[in-house]
Each structure stands twice: as structure tokens, then as C-alpha cells.
């Protein structure tokens, strides 16, 4: 029997441009879902009771101890949806975000030194790691990064980004991968499904501006993805989405509401005891610089979802991190006429031609042209082996042409417009 935790709380971490403060609307979303399907309330209670029974049966003598069980490794595919070249974040940015996730879940980040002394005894190495996939659903080689240019300027929280039919990108099989979509969400920082939702919607959506280390004030260290990954693994907000609510974790103090900004010292609410609120927990909405721990209780709750009968269990036998069975190479009849792309004529007056017959893997990628000042001028989608671009409207001068591919290959050419 397969036990499901249905996606009832899509967690919206909303960052106001005016106040630079994240505000969550998950409670309103939950109320609407329960109104649409009242029977879900009973179903949630039954499933949560099963989780609590499972947790009781596990060893709880873990406080303050390093992780000693097997490390869970989660295959990740990152879908990058971009409308402009500036939104097409680099592979390095993706690697950076994966590093932040691993440091946070393994308690290896340097800012763990900022955890208050009175909470250090329950601060957990969760024994969970994230790795970019090496095999795609067809067992072909992959970098674990998908790039797709889209006509959509800004996405909402309606999950359209998760469907190619809506100009988004279809999810890879969620029984084998964690899907992360990166796109322009406007003022929204990110949101996540909970375990057990529809497989085609399962995963995390992160705003381009807060993915990896960025310039977004207050949320520039990649912690938004850490927060949303916590939701994806079954954690609630630390204040339980209501005044002094329940997050279903025993060792997190009761808290009156989310925490704004980056406080310090002891802040007490809900009779949280002499140590006060745990506003430095990743499941609060504190700014990135002030979040630095998951607790032992949160660790155990996340890891129980990988046990038999729970939806994340299939990830333990995923083929996503196995060596690919198929390594794609161009068919014989499409082998290159030469060993590198050709750009001609150069100089040019009204049209340039980029011949990419040397490698069909450039199909579907985007050509970007900038001027000598680095300003973006124009772009064109590669939909044939030979691409012609009209440059009649360009001012005379030197220009740079760039095409990037998921595997790190890059075409860089320069040309002169007469």
C-alpha cells in the first residue's frame, strides 16, 4: 500500500519589493483546498497519525549526535525557464545552489557557528544530499540542467511553469528525481509541493532572483531553496501557519508567527521558554544570513518519508544518479562538415550566417548578440543547422555572438557590421 501525503499546502514565500520581507499565504491556500474537498481534512489527519506512529517507533536518542545512518542522495533536475538572456542563469549558479543545499542539510555551512548555544544540542546533520542527475528518464546522459526559452515574461503560482503545453517544462518522473523549476516569479521567492501530490506537479519552483547566491537584499545566499526543499520533504513552517500553531515537530518551540528581517538575541512568544523562538530555523522566513539549522525532530520527520510506503522511498533506488546507458552522438548522416561553427560573411552588411552543421546538439539553443559595451542587442532561436540573422538595423561596429549548451559547450564569435 502506498501512503500519500496530498499536496494541500503550496507554500508561497512571497518577497515584497517594498518591505524586502517574505510573507507566506499557505494558510489561505489550505483553507481553499479544504473548502473544495472537505474529505481531505480527515485524510490528512489519518496520514499524519500514521507518520507520528512511525516516528515513535524510530530511535529518538539522537540529540546532538552526528548523522550515522546512510546518507540519502537525491537526484535533481533543474529546469531553467527564461524569457531574456539575463534570466538564463549559468551552470555555475546551479552548482552554487546545489552546494548551499548540501551544506545546509548536512550542517556543513560556516554560518552554523551562529546557532545559539542553547539550540546547538538539537541542531541536526540531516544526512540528506542533492546531486544533479547523470541519467535522464530515457537513461541518456544528462547534465541535470534543462534550459528553455519561453515567451512567458513572468510566471505565477498556478503551476503552468511545470507544463510544456503552457510554455513551461514538463516534470521528469518524480519517483526518480526532484524537479526544481527556476523562472521569473516576480515578487514571489518560491513555492513547493508536499509529498504525495500529482506527479506531474511534484517539485520546487524558485524565483530566478533568489536562486543561488544573488544580489536580492536579504535573500541572497540560496536559502530560499533550502526552505522549499524542507517543504518538499514534509516540513511545515515553524509557527504552524497559525498563531502558536503546530509544525508537527516536538523539538521546535511554539512560535507566534513568522519572523521578519534578521533579529538577534532571545525573542519569546507562545511561552516558548527561556530560550525563546527558533527564528534561525530554515523553516522560518528570516533573512538568509540569519537561518542556520534544522532540528533533530525535523531531520527525523524528513527521513521518515524515505521509508517503505512513503512517496520519497522510490528515490532511494532511482536511476537518476547511475551512469547513463545511452550517450548521444550525432547520427552518421549528420556528422560535421567541419570541426567548429562557421560565421560568415565577416565583415557583414545586412545579414550573417551561422553554420552549426558540426554538431546537431545546438538545435533549440539561443543565439545572443551583444555590442562592445556588453549590452544585449538581439537574439535568435536555432531551429536549423544553418541560421541566417538580419543585422541591417545594427549600427556599424564590433559585435559578439554567443551560444551556450547544457553540457558547458559554448560558441563565441565576433563580427563587424559595416
Q: What do the predicted segments below correspond to?
A:
Residues 1-29, 418:
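Bacterial Sec-dependent N-terminal signal peptides
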Residues 5, 33-41, 217-218, 335-337:
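Short hydrophobic "helix-edge" motifs at membrane interfaces and signal-peptide entry regions
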Residues 9, 13, 65, 119, ...:
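Residues embedded in well-ordered secondary-structure elements
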Residues 20-100, 104:
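Primarily auto-inhibitory N-terminal propeptides
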Residues 69-71, 123, 173, 347:
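Short, surface-exposed loop/turn motifs at beta-strand boundaries within globular domains
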Residues 76-86, 91-136, 147-226, 232-334:
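Extracellular (secreted or membrane-anchored) zinc-dependent metallopeptidases
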Residues 142-143:
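Phosphate-/polyanion-interacting regions in eukaryotic proteins
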Residues 336-344, 348-418:
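C-terminal outer-membrane/trafficking sorting elements
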